[in-house]
């Protein structure tokens, strides 16, 4: 069975529209947005694991690189996994506490590009919407592969720069250039964007991600995260994928 066979059955247009409708609440109602994203991410990881290994994810250890404010911790724990979150920002770690129940895993303050874990120490290593926020995204990817055990899964998902959501809260102004978009946002709102181009937001392309993933020899699948199954072929079209694949998922299985 191919890694995406189970997920393909769930990748419907209604799912895509449901997730798209949640995006507009990212700033105004983060519980609604991140709660929906966390639930969908757990289901995606479960589908990928079961299709690849034929076994359940229950009692596996998942390392979430860029765990953020706790939504994923609760969702993965509720699904029966042992959750460990890595987060470099202490503010995000403190924000996680009210959103996680008492048994929702643990958090480690560290950088995703220098993970403080032994080689092959986790079953699943996940990074959701983090690679575009670090200056060395493929060093992050290499670290994810290093800590994932042979036969496990590393799932790296990131926002493609030239896609419609590449500018994050700066909107479509990122098509004018990242620095210009950040300055425009600052003039309009009186403060720098949280996702500030050149410091906390970087231009990461689909082509670069696919090139890196293929170079590892561990690539099991690549697909657009939020698209219905019939649109997954966009990933194979150079140029077009940069604009129409809003978020690329790279699934790697180290041996």
UniProtKB/Swiss-Prot annotation:
Highest taxon above the source species: Bacteria
A molecular-function term among this protein's GO annotations: S-adenosylmethionine-dependent methyltransferase activity
Keyword Methyltransferase tagged: yes
Known EC number: 2.1.1.-
Record InterPro entries: Methyltransf_11, SAM-dependent_MTases_sf
Database matches in Gene3D superfamilies: Vaccinia Virus protein VP39
Keyword field contains Transferase: yes
Keywords: Methyltransferase, Transferase
SUPFAM superfamilies: S-adenosyl-L-methionine-dependent methyltransferases
One GO BP annotation of this record: methylation
First-level EC class: transferase
Stated family: Belongs to the methyltransferase superfamily.
Matches recorded under PANTHER family: 2-METHOXY-6-POLYPRENYL-1,4-BENZOQUINOL METHYLASE, MITOCHONDRIAL (PTHR43591:SF24), METHYLTRANSFERASE (PTHR43591)
Protein name: Uncharacterized methyltransferase Mflv_0427
Species of provenance: Mycolicibacterium gilvum (strain PYR-GCK)
């Amino acid at each position: 069975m191919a890694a995406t066979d189970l997920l393909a059955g769930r990748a419907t247009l209604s799912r895509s529209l449901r997730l798209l409708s949640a995006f507009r609440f990212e700033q105004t109602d983060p519980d609604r947005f991140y709660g929906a994203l966390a639930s969908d991410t757990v289901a995606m990881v479960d589908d990928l694991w079961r299709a690849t290994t034929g076994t359940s994810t229950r009692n596996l250890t998942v390392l979430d690189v860029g765990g953020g404010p706790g939504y994923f911790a609760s969702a993965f724990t509720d699904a029966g996994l042992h959750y460990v979150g890595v987060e470099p920002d202490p503010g995000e770690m403190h924000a996680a506490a009210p959103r996680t129940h008492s048994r929702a895993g643990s958090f480690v303050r560290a950088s995703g590009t220098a993970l403080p874990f032994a080689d092959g120490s986790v079953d699943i290593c996940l990074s959701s919407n983090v690679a575009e926020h670090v200056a060395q995204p493929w060093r992050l990817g290499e670290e994810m592969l290093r800590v994932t055990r042979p036969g496990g899964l590393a799932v790296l998902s990131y926002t493609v720069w030239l896609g419609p959501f590449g500018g994050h809260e700066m909107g479509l102004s990122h098509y004018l250039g990242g620095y210009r978009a950040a300055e425009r946002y600052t003039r309009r709102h009186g403060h720098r964007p949280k996702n500030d181009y050149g410091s906390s937001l970087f231009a990461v392309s689909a082509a670069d991600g696919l090139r890196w993933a293929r170079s590892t020899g561990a690539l099991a699948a690549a697909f657009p995260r939020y698209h219905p199954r019939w649109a997954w072929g966009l990933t194979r079209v150079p140029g077009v994928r940069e604009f129409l694949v809003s978020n690329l998922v790279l699934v790697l299985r180290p041996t």
